Amino acid sequence: LSDHPRLIEASKKMMDRRGFGMSSVRFICGTQDVHKELEAAISDYFKTDDTILYAACFDANGGVFEPLFTDQDAIISDSLNHASIIDGVRLCKAKRYRYANADMADLERCLKEAQAQRFRIICTDGVFSMDGNVAPIDKICDLAEKYDALVMVDESHSAGVVGATGHGVSELCKTYGRVDIYTGTLGKAFGGALGGFTTGRKEIIDMLRQRSRPYLFSNSLAPCIIGASLEV
C-alpha cells in the first residue's frame, strides 16, 4: 500500500495542511486532532477502549511492560516472539517465563509456576514473523481465564492480513473482548511507512500515557504518516 496513489495523495495533502513534522513530543505541542482521530480509528478497528501512538511498534513493545509490571509480577512470553517484545521484557523487573512456540501444554506449565506472582501476562505475536504460523489466541485466552492472567497480542504481522475481513487474529479466532492489550505497526498493512501503537483497556492506556518512556520522550508521528494511515 505504500505505493498506492491514494495513500501518496493523502500524505501530500496532510503535509500541506499540517506541516512536515510536529517538532515535539505528544504532551507538549505534538498532538493534533488527526493524532486523536487515528487513535480512535485504531480503537474502533480492534474493538478496544483507547489507543496510544508510538514512533514505531518497537517502541510500543519496548514501552508497554515497565510501566505496568514490577518484580512482583510475571511475564510469560512465546519463544518465537518478535525482538521488540524480548527487549521490552528485558527492561522490566517482572519474573520471566518462556514457553515453546504455540505450545499450550508448555504455556500451562508456565502459568502454574507463576501462580505466586501478583499479576501474570501472556505475550504472543499474532502471526510469527519468521515462520508465518498463527498463534492459537482462543486457546491462549482460555488458559488466561483459567489461571487469571492478562493477554497481550502483537498484531504487526496479522492485522490487515488474517481474518475474514483482515482484522487480525482476534477476528480469526473470535476473541474480541478477551485480549487486554494489542500492539501493532503502521509500517506494514496500515500504510507501510513507520509508526506503532498500543490499544486496549482504558485503564492500561491511561497508565501508558503517563509512564511509557518511548511515548513521553519521542517526537510525535508526522502528520503525513497520520494522513496516509487514516486513508487505509
Show where each model-derived region lies.
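Short, small-residue-enriched loops and turns at beta-alpha junctions
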Residues: 1, 28-32, 83, 105, ...
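Conserved N-terminal alpha-helix of the aminotransferase class I/II PLP-enzyme fold
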Residues: 6-57
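Active-site phosphate-binding strand-loop segment of PLP-dependent enzymes
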Residues: 97, 101-153
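Short, structured coil segments at secondary-structure junctions
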Residues: 71, 91-93, 147, 178
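Active-site PLP attachment segment
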Residues: 165, 171-207
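Conserved PLP-anchoring active-site segment centered on the Schiff-base-forming lysine
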Residues: 64-83
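PLP-dependent aminotransferase class I/II
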Residues: 190-232
